[in-house]
């Protein structure tokens, strides 16, 4: 196959799609190059047959950043890339989410997508290039796929408006970082963080991106027309309508009644009981469907029952209408020895959230393609199996936990104080202790509460809510505060976090095409109503950050010294600063501009370390009295140490009002004496007096 190259203009950039030169044994492979900035190789492989034992669609997406792409060699002992970083995991999820709903229903052949960053100038994020490459590789592969998709990043500035595909530098000045993906006619995925933008501004960004990435879809279609492989001869399995009708006829009413049980565990127990009855009745004998087929049919009846009830205006599973938030229970300060804590309960979803403050040295060191950087804010989300009443695997953090933690982090990050205002490292951990829908948004609420409880000066409290959608034909219902079942059986998962003033995070995943601007507008409006309700209830428990940090938190003292004094504080080989830290049990961070941050487990420890630094960096003040130690005696006087590293001369004439023949008649080495600073010349030499101390003290010096 001869290489096929397609170039197109995407905003300010020229994008090149190339297929047929690299990775030719993959089902589809495309090398995406954006200007001379970034290149990503995307491969897609699809298995020709399905594994019937799996019973689901085994799609896997792997995004990987190779250090050679940025001209670097990996660190560590093995000098090769190890397990995926958090950035790689999040980007893998970002690519997976818009493509998964576009594979046909019933398609269960394994599909693997691998996106490899092979070259980067480190100026822009390669994720959009990887998403474009995924769309193109699927389009040329012949695998059944209802694409192509387009993708774009959007920034926003109040004065200049929306900006397409900003680089890292432009994002720093932006109030918005949003990634949008979708097809020619529909938006399928949104991932964003913002600085309190309005709902209209957020919706405008989504629509702006959808208009702009039409250029991507057009180019991919042209590439597929020229270089695409024949589409697979695959047909969807026929639905067993007779089985569906039989189950609905005999068990439909019981299933519908089960979905009126408001307590999750009781509802699941009743549905399990009905499922067993259905499997026993309709499978097992010769000529009857398999147990798995009957279970799938039962699930289809569940799906249709819940959806029909909702769009026809009946109460939801737990009896609520479409706009009501579940009952809230909010507590702060629930753990005595932590720095800040909160227990946030919304219905059957509960998060125990803990905030911990640390020193600058506790910041996370990130080794990225762009270079090393420090992250002084971490939010970790844990989802133990007991939260849904199950036994399960315990071990490494999963992709879902990383993704939910990042979403919760996006929700609160914009409301944190700057490093200058609050130079602590902050770690928030959300332990999901119960789950029945929207645990990530419970984590946002809990994180805001725990941070305020810890005394972190938040700009404003933050709350989050998850919205859902059920759409049948022209009928639709937007649901506020969805349950787990409504998430699973619905057409949209729409999470919004923000303050009373505006949106700080928006995540949207849509499983169907045909979500209109009107529906998104209604969802954002209902989410605002729910968010304000939750913020109101949170403010009744804690309305603003505590005025003082927790007594358990480390004490931080800030000071600044002359830059030429930095080496005195550090000492030869770090000996001086190490000694201060060991003796006071405090930690000291010194910046190149002379800024010093001192952290102590107690206020006393931090203060002791500060006094040690002050004593090292202090200058002798003319007219001030010091208690010093005689270091050396000479014929014409004595040298007295008044500050660390600073000796002054007491001339023999300044020792006493009486005439002195020999200095040693009055002073001895090691003796402590009070001295008055008479002068400091331009070479830093200090003149001292002992005889004038009494007069100076009498005058109140």
Curated annotation (Swiss-Prot):
<keyword id="KW-0479">Metal-binding</keyword>
<dbReference type="Pfam" id="PF00013">
    <property type="entry name" value="KH_1"/>
</dbReference>
<comment type="similarity">
    <text>Belongs to the polyribonucleotide nucleotidyltransferase family.</text>
</comment>
<feature type="domain" description="S1 motif">
    <location>
        <begin position="623"/>
        <end position="691"/>
    </location>
</feature>
<dbReference type="Pfam" id="PF03726">
    <property type="entry name" value="PNPase"/>
</dbReference>
<dbReference type="InterPro" id="IPR012340">
    <property type="entry name" value="NA-bd_OB-fold"/>
</dbReference>
<feature type="binding site">
    <location>
        <position position="493"/>
    </location>
    <ligand>
        <name>Mg(2+)</name>
    </ligand>
</feature>
<dbReference type="InterPro" id="IPR036612">
    <property type="entry name" value="KH_dom_type_1_sf"/>
</dbReference>
<dbReference type="InterPro" id="IPR015847">
    <property type="entry name" value="ExoRNase_PH_dom2"/>
</dbReference>
<dbReference type="GO" id="GO:0000175">
    <property type="term" value="F:3'-5'-RNA exonuclease activity"/>
</dbReference>
<keyword id="KW-0548">Nucleotidyltransferase</keyword>
<keyword id="KW-0460">Magnesium</keyword>
<dbReference type="InterPro" id="IPR004088">
    <property type="entry name" value="KH_dom_type_1"/>
</dbReference>
<dbReference type="GO" id="GO:0003723">
    <property type="term" value="F:RNA binding"/>
</dbReference>
<dbReference type="InterPro" id="IPR036345">
    <property type="entry name" value="ExoRNase_PH_dom2_sf"/>
</dbReference>
<protein>
    <recommendedName>
        <fullName>Polyribonucleotide nucleotidyltransferase</fullName>
        <ecNumber>2.7.7.8</ecNumber>
    </recommendedName>
</protein>
<keyword id="KW-0694">RNA-binding</keyword>
<comment type="subunit">
    <text>Component of the RNA degradosome, which is a multiprotein complex involved in RNA processing and mRNA degradation.</text>
</comment>
<feature type="domain" description="KH">
    <location>
        <begin position="554"/>
        <end position="613"/>
    </location>
</feature>
<feature type="binding site">
    <location>
        <position position="487"/>
    </location>
    <ligand>
        <name>Mg(2+)</name>
    </ligand>
</feature>
<dbReference type="Pfam" id="PF03725">
    <property type="entry name" value="RNase_PH_C"/>
</dbReference>
<dbReference type="InterPro" id="IPR004087">
    <property type="entry name" value="KH_dom"/>
</dbReference>
<dbReference type="GO" id="GO:0005829">
    <property type="term" value="C:cytosol"/>
</dbReference>
<dbReference type="Pfam" id="PF00575">
    <property type="entry name" value="S1"/>
</dbReference>
<dbReference type="GO" id="GO:0006402">
    <property type="term" value="P:mRNA catabolic process"/>
</dbReference>
<dbReference type="InterPro" id="IPR003029">
    <property type="entry name" value="S1_domain"/>
</dbReference>
<dbReference type="GO" id="GO:0000287">
    <property type="term" value="F:magnesium ion binding"/>
</dbReference>
<keyword id="KW-0808">Transferase</keyword>
<dbReference type="InterPro" id="IPR027408">
    <property type="entry name" value="PNPase/RNase_PH_dom_sf"/>
</dbReference>
<dbReference type="InterPro" id="IPR012162">
    <property type="entry name" value="PNPase"/>
</dbReference>
<dbReference type="GO" id="GO:0004654">
    <property type="term" value="F:polyribonucleotide nucleotidyltransferase activity"/>
</dbReference>
<dbReference type="InterPro" id="IPR001247">
    <property type="entry name" value="ExoRNase_PH_dom1"/>
</dbReference>
<dbReference type="Pfam" id="PF01138">
    <property type="entry name" value="RNase_PH"/>
</dbReference>
<dbReference type="GO" id="GO:0006396">
    <property type="term" value="P:RNA processing"/>
</dbReference>
<comment type="function">
    <text>Involved in mRNA degradation. Catalyzes the phosphorolysis of single-stranded polyribonucleotides processively in the 3'- to 5'-direction.</text>
</comment>
<dbReference type="InterPro" id="IPR020568">
    <property type="entry name" value="Ribosomal_Su5_D2-typ_SF"/>
</dbReference>
<keyword id="KW-0963">Cytoplasm</keyword>
<dbReference type="InterPro" id="IPR015848">
    <property type="entry name" value="PNPase_PH_RNA-bd_bac/org-type"/>
</dbReference>
């Amino acid at each position: 196959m001869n290489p096929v190259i397609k170039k197109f203009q995407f905003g300010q950039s020229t994008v090149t799609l190339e297929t047929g030169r690299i990775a030719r044994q993959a089902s589809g492979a495309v090398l995406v190059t954006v200007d001379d900035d970034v290149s990503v190789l995307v491969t897609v492989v699809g298995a020709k047959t399905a594994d019937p034992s799996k019973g689901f669609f085994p799609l896997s997406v792997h995004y990987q950043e190779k250090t050679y792409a940025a001209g670097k060699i990996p660190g560590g002992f093995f000098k090769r890339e190890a397990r995926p970083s958090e950035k790689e995991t999040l980007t893998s999820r970002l690519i997976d989410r818009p493509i998964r709903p576009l594979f046909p229903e019933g398609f269960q052949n394994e599909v693997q997508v691998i996106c490899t960053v092979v070259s980067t100038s480190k100026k822009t994020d390669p994720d959009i290039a990887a998403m474009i490459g995924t769309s193109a590789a699927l389009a040329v592969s012949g695998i059944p796929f209802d694409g192509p998709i387009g993708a774009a990043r959007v920034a926003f500035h109040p004065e200049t408006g929306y900006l397409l595909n900003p680089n890292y530098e432009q994002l720093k000045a932006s109030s918005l970082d949003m990634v949008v993906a979708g097809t020619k006619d529909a938006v399928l995925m949104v991932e964003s963080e913002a600085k309190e933008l309005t709902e209209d501004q957020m919706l405008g960004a989504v629509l702006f991106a959808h208009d702009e990435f039409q250029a991507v879809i057009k180019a991919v279609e042209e590439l597929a027309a020229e270089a695409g492989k024949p589409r697979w001869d695959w047909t969807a399995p026929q639905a067993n309508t007779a089985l569906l009708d039989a189950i609905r006829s005999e068990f439909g009413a019981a299933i519908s009644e089960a979905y009126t049980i408001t307590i999750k565990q009781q509802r699941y127990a009743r549905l399990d009981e009905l499922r067993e009855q259905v499997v026993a009745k309709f499978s097992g004998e010769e000529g009857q469907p398999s147990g798995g087929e009957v279970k799938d049919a039962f699930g289809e009846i569940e799906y249709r029952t819940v959806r029909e009830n909702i769009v026809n205006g009946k109460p939801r599973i737990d009896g609520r209408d479409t706009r009501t938030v579940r009952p809230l229970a909010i507590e702060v300060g629930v753990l005595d020895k932590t720095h800040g804590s909160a227990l946030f309960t919304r219905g059957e979803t509960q998060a125990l959230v803990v905030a911990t403050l640390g020193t600058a040295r506790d910041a996370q060191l990130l080794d990225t393609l762009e270079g090393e950087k420090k992250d002084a804010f971490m939010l970790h989300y844990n989802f133990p199996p007991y939260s849904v009443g199950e036994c399960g695997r315990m071990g490494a953090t999963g992709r879902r936990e990383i993704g939910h933690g990042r979403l919760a982090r996006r929700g609160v990050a914009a409301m944190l104080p700057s490093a200058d205002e609050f130079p602590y490292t902050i770690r928030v951990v959300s332990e999901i202790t119960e789950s029945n829908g929207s645990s990530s948004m419970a984590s946002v609420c809990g994180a805001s509460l725990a941070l305020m409880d810890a005394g972190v000066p938040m700009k404003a409290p933050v709350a989050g809510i998850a919205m859902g959608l059920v759409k049948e034909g022209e009928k639709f219902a937007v649901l506020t505060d969805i349950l787990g079942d409504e998430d699973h059986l619905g057409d949209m998962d729409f999470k919004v976090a923000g303050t009373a003033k505006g949106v700080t995070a928006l995540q949207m995943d849509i499983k169907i095409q045909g979500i209109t601007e009107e529906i998104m507008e209604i969802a954002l409006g209902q989410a605002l109503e729910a968010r304000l309700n939750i913020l109101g209830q949170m403010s009744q428990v804690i309305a603003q950050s505590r005025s003082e940090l927790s007594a358990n938190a480390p004490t931080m003292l800030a000071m600044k010294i002359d830059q030429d004094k930095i080496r005195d504080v550090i000492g030869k080989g770090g000996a001086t600063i190490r000694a201060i830290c060991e003796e006071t049990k405090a930690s000291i961070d010194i910046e190149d501009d002379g800024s010093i941050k001192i952290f102590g487990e107690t206020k006393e420890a931090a203060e002791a370390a500060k006094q040690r630094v002050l004593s090292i960096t202090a200058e002798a003040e003319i007219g001030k009295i010091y208690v010093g130690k005689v270091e050396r005696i000479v014929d014409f006087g004595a040298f007295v140490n008044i500050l660390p590293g600073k000796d002054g001369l007491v001339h023999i004439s300044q020792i006493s009002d009486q005439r002195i023949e020999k200095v040693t008649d009055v002073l001895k080495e090691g003796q402590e004496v009070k001295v008055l600073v008479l002068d400091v010349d331009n070479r830093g030499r200090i003149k001292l007096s002992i005889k004038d101390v009494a007069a100076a003290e009498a005058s109140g010096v």
